[in-house]
């Protein structure tokens, strides 16, 4: 079990991973890669996981995280000063950034080399996004009520 000091609302994932890695290494267990996945993705695709692990084992990156490419117009800022970050729309013509926005889904799967965890720098050095294209795979369910909503939606829309 991790100590109470690492169970507060402002505890970072980097702190928890560093503690866990130190505990494992103190027991003589050493790993080339650490995988982190939250339980909120019930439709996580095993082929995506396999592909991400293979990409990590190719040795090009220190960190690989799952991501979603948002193709719709994405805004940033306050309501008085909004700026387009990326995306496409037939209504809004952009003059700046033509790129789409990547949303981190590190809870879907985050693969990190232990050297990055020791430095508590999960997203520095050589970081790579693995873009997931399956919208069902990235569906996150955070609560019982969200789960019930999804199940009820599927019951209404799926016929046998």
Describe every region a protein language model picked out.
Residues 1-35, 43-51:
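Short phosphate-binding loop-to-helix
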Residues 11-15, 39-136:
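Conserved core of the sugar-phosphate nucleotidyltransferase
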Residues 21, 53, 151-154:
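A generic alpha-helix structural signal
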Residues 25-26, 57, 155:
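Residue-level signal for alpha-helix termini/capping positions
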Residues 26-30, 61, 159:
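Secondary-structure boundary/capping residues
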């Amino acid at each position: 079990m991790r100590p109470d000091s690492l169970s507060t609302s402002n505890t970072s994932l980097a702190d928890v991973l560093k503690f866990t890695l130190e505990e494992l290494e103190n027991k003589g267990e050493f790993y080339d890669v650490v995988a982190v996945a939250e339980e909120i993705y019930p439709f996580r695709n095993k082929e995506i996981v396999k592909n991400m692990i293979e990409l990590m084992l190719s040795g090009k990156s220190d960190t690989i995280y799952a991501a979603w490419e948002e193709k719709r117009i994405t805004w940033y800022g306050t309501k008085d000063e909004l700026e387009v970050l990326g995306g496409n729309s037939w209504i809004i013509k952009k003059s700046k950034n033509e790129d789409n926005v990547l949303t981190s889904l590190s809870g879907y799967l985050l693969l990190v080399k232990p050297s990055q965890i020791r430095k508590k720098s999960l997203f520095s050095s050589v970081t790579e996004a693995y873009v997931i294209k399956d919208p069902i795979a990235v569906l996150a369910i955070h609560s019982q009520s969200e789960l019930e909503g999804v199940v009820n939606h599927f019951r209404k829309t799926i016929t046998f």
